[in-house]
């Protein structure tokens, strides 16, 4: 987002929250933010809403018309907006399947804010096809809250397009919460092992916060459920700068 704002000459402000007493350190992402000229506003996690409100008021007083990508100060209201991006991605997947004459029975990916999962499930519901959309939760959210956010995104998307949903539609939310490894940004040595293995074998960079954790979770799930001989797609959602942060970590 900061990159796009820079290219369009739109001022970018980022509210950067952290846990109490959490040490703030420089990362490749933070260095890129500096390159893009983004204004980073730190705050405690308990003060996000207040900081968003104060920042919006400050920018309005300067004559700007600020837009908060999550909606209101509490982060609600825009759940349906990013969904279209992954509805489009779902269509690309279906096109690829038709060209290659294959069908993915499972689609796995990291699930954090819920936007990716809302979009993929929406595309799946519109297509009315048969498969399981499997989000691997990488945040510290509780399962009930995480599923609520995903469902809200789906509802917003369908309501704005005046397309009916049925209660059965909610049953298409498959969220794996048992592979969080302690919560957001935390990981174990098994996750690191999987990251090393995938990079050395296939040249694919993953990170322990998002893609690496989700890929590990997917492999664990497939092993535990004894799923074999199935067509499976894993969506790499980005995060390459975090891979290089991982390389510089003395624990790796």
Segments and roles (model prediction):
Residues 1-11, 121-128, 217-226:
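Alpha-helix C-terminal capping segments
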Residues 10-54:
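A glycine-rich helix N-cap at a beta->alpha junction
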Residues 15-16, 43, 68-72, 110-111, ...:
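Short beta-strand segments
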Residues 55-88, 93:
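Phosphate/diphosphate-binding glycine-rich loops and adjacent basic-rich segments that engage nucleotide
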Residues 83-174, 236-252:
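Glycine-rich phosphate/pyrophosphate-binding loop at beta-loop-alpha junctions
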